[in-house]
Amino acid sequence: MVMFYLGNVLKLSLFGSSHGESVGSLVDGFPVGYKIPLDYIQKYMEYRRPGNTIITSQRKEEDVVKIISGMHNGFTDGSPITMIIENKNVISSYYEELKENPRPGHSDYTLYVKYGDFRNYEGGGFLSGRMTAPLVAAGALAKSYLDSLGIKITSYMKSIGEVTCDEIRGDPYNFETRIPDPEKNSLATSLLVDIMKSGDSIGGRIDTIVEGLPPGVGEPFFNSVESEISRAMFSIPAVKAIEFGDGFTLSKMKGSEANDPFTVLDGHILTKTNHNGGILGGMTTGMPVKFSIAVKPTPSIHKKQDTINLISKEKSEITVKGRHDPCVAIRAVPVVECLTAFVLMDLMMMGGFIDRYGNVRGRSLL
């Protein structure tokens, strides 16, 4: 059974494929009477859009979001919101060879096992990174709503290969690698140029910080903040790992080191440290929510690779054609940011912090 939806009260469905006429999202449950900020949504589409720099895929798409339902006179009207993004720069001929020869590291083989000859293999079909475009469109709508409540979500490239950012020194979107540090951005750019020349690719790590969330967001047991964010993050192609707070480092610490002592500041209960990433018992503590994801290298590379012919079961070789990112993690930054917003807004609606009519509970906590 295929389920193309995310969310519990606020729901998101996807449709389309990489080389189809369009891709899109359907958002159901969004509060009524909210003015849809089209310019804001388009800004995040531009952050994700391919072809903007030499270090991203040269598939040049306009990625203009068209809303065909759920909006009346610029405001949400209570019905499902349908967002469509056209595919205009498609070259399917690159993928004919892949019909019988699956790319290592890609979903070509698993799609064949599951759907056989009915699978859509062109451009990766509905499992392509292209499907992150409608994720951004829907997520940017939620992010704008949380922005209005004073909830700030920031995602950035913590590292590309061995180039690591130690501190945020500017807006990540002012740097082409999304590493918010001038020196490290320059180093990463040089690394990516070399990677491209060699026909290879490289992975990266994306860190996210959420500030301004009230305590108590999250629904134990199976709808915890961690489980809901994790489910969403693993819907992003190439994401292979996630950790919250100090994550795996906590396994090496003592309880006296890992526990975050409570304190009071200006009448608000906070913690002196934040090793647990602002989450305890699956619910927010009021401290910043922090998590990191690992994104594997783009599997489509221009180096010759060993594979198997699916029909003959004999060994074969493949050199992937087409236009691909040397580091797919870079364009995933706005995807992570926007999808995080969607999940958190859904959890806030589940917990009664926000209702279908835009009423906000405990506004003073925000």
From Swiss-Prot:
<keyword id="KW-0288">FMN</keyword>
<feature type="binding site">
    <location>
        <position position="281"/>
    </location>
    <ligand>
        <name>FMN</name>
    </ligand>
</feature>
<feature type="binding site">
    <location>
        <position position="48"/>
    </location>
    <ligand>
        <name>NADP(+)</name>
    </ligand>
</feature>
<dbReference type="GO" id="GO:0005829">
    <property type="term" value="C:cytosol"/>
</dbReference>
<feature type="binding site">
    <location>
        <begin position="296"/>
        <end position="300"/>
    </location>
    <ligand>
        <name>FMN</name>
    </ligand>
</feature>
<keyword id="KW-0057">Aromatic amino acid biosynthesis</keyword>
<keyword id="KW-0274">FAD</keyword>
<dbReference type="Pfam" id="PF01264">
    <property type="entry name" value="Chorismate_synt"/>
</dbReference>
<keyword id="KW-0521">NADP</keyword>
<dbReference type="GO" id="GO:0008652">
    <property type="term" value="P:amino acid biosynthetic process"/>
</dbReference>
<protein>
    <recommendedName>
        <fullName>Chorismate synthase</fullName>
        <ecNumber>4.2.3.5</ecNumber>
    </recommendedName>
</protein>
<comment type="function">
    <text>This reaction introduces a second double bond into the aromatic ring system.</text>
</comment>
<feature type="binding site">
    <location>
        <position position="323"/>
    </location>
    <ligand>
        <name>FMN</name>
    </ligand>
</feature>
<dbReference type="GO" id="GO:0009073">
    <property type="term" value="P:aromatic amino acid family biosynthetic process"/>
</dbReference>
<keyword id="KW-0456">Lyase</keyword>
<comment type="pathway">
    <text>Metabolic intermediate biosynthesis; chorismate biosynthesis; chorismate from D-erythrose 4-phosphate and phosphoenolpyruvate: step 7/7.</text>
</comment>
<dbReference type="GO" id="GO:0009423">
    <property type="term" value="P:chorismate biosynthetic process"/>
</dbReference>
<comment type="similarity">
    <text>Belongs to the chorismate synthase family.</text>
</comment>
<keyword id="KW-0028">Amino-acid biosynthesis</keyword>
<dbReference type="GO" id="GO:0010181">
    <property type="term" value="F:FMN binding"/>
</dbReference>
<dbReference type="InterPro" id="IPR000453">
    <property type="entry name" value="Chorismate_synth"/>
</dbReference>
<dbReference type="InterPro" id="IPR020541">
    <property type="entry name" value="Chorismate_synthase_CS"/>
</dbReference>
<dbReference type="InterPro" id="IPR035904">
    <property type="entry name" value="Chorismate_synth_AroC_sf"/>
</dbReference>
<dbReference type="GO" id="GO:0004107">
    <property type="term" value="F:chorismate synthase activity"/>
</dbReference>
<keyword id="KW-0285">Flavoprotein</keyword>
